[in-house]
Amino acid sequence: MDQDIKTVIQYPVGATEFDIPFDYLSRKFVRVSLVSDDNRRLLSNITEYRYVSKTRVKLLVETTGFDRVEIRRFTSASERIVDFSDGSVLRASDLNVSQIQSAHIAEEARDAALMAMPQDDAGNLDARNRRIVRLAPGIAGTDAVNKDQLDTTLGEAGGILSDMKDLEGEIHDYIEKFADDTALVRGVAWVYNLGSADGGETVITINKSTRTYAVPYIEVNGSRQEVGYHYSFDLETQQITLATPLKAGDFVMVMTTESQLPVETLLASSVGAASIGTATGETVEERLTRLYGHFVHPETYGAVGDGITDDRVALQRSLDVAYENALNGTGPSTVRWSGDYMVSLNPNSLGVSGELAAGRSALCIRPGVSIEGKGTVRLDPSFTGSQSGAVITNWAGPADDCSIKDIRIYGGKDVATGTGITGILILDSQRVVISDVKVLNSTAGGIYLRKGATEGLYGCSFSKVSGCTVDNAGYIGIQMERPYDNTVIGNTINRCEDNGIDVFGNVNDATVTGIAQSTLITGNNIRDVLNGVFIESCGNTNITGNYIADFRSSGVIYNRINSAANDNSLTSNVLIGASGASAGVSFKNSVGYCTVASNRIQNSDYGIRCVGGGITGLNILPNTMKNIAKTLLFVEARNNGLVKSRMSTQFYEGAQVGGIPSNTSPRGVPHRFPSRLSYIVDIQPFWATEQGTREDNFERAKGTLASITGWGSKCALYDTIVAGDTVVSLNSSSVAVGEYLEINAEVYKVTSVSATYAVVRKWTGSDYTAGDYAAVIISNPSYIIRRVQWGEQ
């Protein structure tokens, strides 16, 4: 009988590296344990030992209390390395691996049987010079006795054993249960039909009191049969289906794997998760470690997550632990919020001058910390007051490399008694990422990246707000103060009482362009706000590809407080106003140097609006406009309202009716801010899709004054038809009172008309004055008629 143990080896302690003398298919089939006569400890790979090479391991733990190191191969009988499917290609290498796995299982089963208590060649149980421990006292005459029984018997007999009874045993099973190193799974040999088959059987039912979980192999008359080739095993029916029927008298031994403990007890134990495999080949315990070992969970620190209990302290603790880990490199720096957490304002939160009032914020994020998960943070609506604060902020200082992803924040608007609490406010930080966050019902702003109290020109730098939703905010949706290389992309902003997106860079004591660099605002969907995007006293922004609808004032506005809003670009946006909206684009208070191109502007009084004077350097390339109630390009009635600018031909969907919408505000009106558009302003007429005159600068009509025979073949008379006034050869069917005539580069105002003439008075520098102008209105000059609005707007 072969007594060579091949799959288990023990070494004395003292060294740190030990050889693996057997081959194996996977490292998870190799178990390293520390053992002694009365104790055993199974070690974990990576944390308690590691592989130096394929055939050598190194211990990483102390061996105190143990005298041996055991290395054992334990190949899974249920987790196949190779799984064959119908129709697949059969490769020799796969067959070899499958065959090796079966062979390994068989070797391990044989070794386990030998190590448990095998039979010798005479059929006797052989303890192999080892103690049999935990032996119950014998009862029947053929039972073995333990040492206590023997000592008692010897004592009662005065220490003299006069007679020894021969121990006789009858073996009823082919082999007893044997244990692996976890003492949970037992391999048992079972003999079919008392060792003699009836003949013809193709199905064998294992009828044992304990449940069989696998059949690694069977032997028929000593010939080994492999699972998957010679037979299959059904766990539910406990039946073995044979490929070849048995013959009468065949001796069939079945090697089974069964549980000593109930499955429920096994799975509920500390090693239960490690006993369950997954489709990826890892155990449930390994999967949980991989998923949750990378996160800090507030539930660890007492968070309830029911949306009612105040979890602020637990959430803050999770943030603090993540920061300590990030700082020391000792653990996960990502916090996973997956519950529904109520948080109150922290009375100990610090204030930041001009940004946060003390005691008005809930949670503080620190550098290197990430927040993610599908969780919800609800601000306790019982707060009062109106001072500024935030649900999540960084009152302790810059929070470089922080991120907030995929959570919801409810601010309590419409139910809270207080106001002023923004959803997220990050100050003076670099590489901030806020993505897929929903800020709902904020009593102030949604998501802010701002300049705090620290030194330096800029607020947050190299940062991004993407894929977020801000809905029903009491103030601004997304705001950046003094940004540097920041991006706002793909966000949805709805129902803000102020601006959808706001960029602020004012410098109080400067008149140059405000502070902002490389700001990209793109792909955002903004609806039902006061202004869609507000660029306040700063430049270097690129606003492109946004959809802005239902704004109440302007789709995009550029404004100066102290420093200018220059050097900007506005392209390819859709700007659709709500009823009564002022303008698609507004420029206010000496700003400019902006390219406006390829935008769709719709449903507002003005397409582009310039107010406050000094609007400079606008490059208005073709845009599409529709439903503009008054003017495509409005310039406020003041000198130098728009200078050094140009407007290309605009595409207007619709018709101009009665000169409305006008192409621009009146240009060149001598009596009303003649330099309203000045210093090289080039304006091209617009183009309309519907029939109409497509007037430019309120030019209603033009022609040549006709000579009248009754006037001596003249086209103008003085003091003849109307005393003290000049009349021209136009009548009430061609010109109206209040309209203006341009004749020979002079401007005249029509003061009255009849069926045969029109009375005109000339602009003389201070007023339209009656006088003799017939002497210069000669030789049938050409004329231009401009509408009344030309002189009044």
UniProtKB/Swiss-Prot annotation:
Optimum temperature is 25 degrees Celsius. It comes from the Viruses. GO terms for cellular component: virus tail. Optimum pH is 6.0. Transmembrane segments: none annotated. Keywords: Degradation of host capsule during virus entry, Degradation of host cell envelope components during virus entry, Host-virus interaction, Viral attachment to host adhesion receptor, Viral attachment to host cell, Viral tail protein, Virion, Virus entry into host cell. It holds the Pfam family Beta_helix. It is found in: Virion. The keyword Transcription regulation does not apply. GO terms for biological process: adhesion receptor-mediated virion attachment to host cell; symbiont entry into host cell via disruption of host cell envelope; symbiont entry into host cell via disruption of host cell glycocalyx. InterPro entries: Beta_helix, Para_beta_helix_rpt-2, PbH1, Pectin_lyas_fold, Pectin_lyase_fold/virulence, Phage_T7_tail_fibre-like_N, Serralysin-like_metalloprot_C. The N-terminus anchors the RBP to the virion. The central part and C-terminus probably binds and degrades the host exopolysaccharides. Functions as a receptor binding protein (RBP) and probably mediates the attachment to the host capsular exopolysaccharides. Displays a depolymerase activity that specifically degrades the K47-type polysaccharides of Klebsiella pneumoniae capsule, which allows the phage to reach the host cell membrane and bind the entry receptor. In the N-terminal section; belongs to the Teseptimavirus fiber family. Homotrimer. This is Depolymerase, capsule K47-specific.
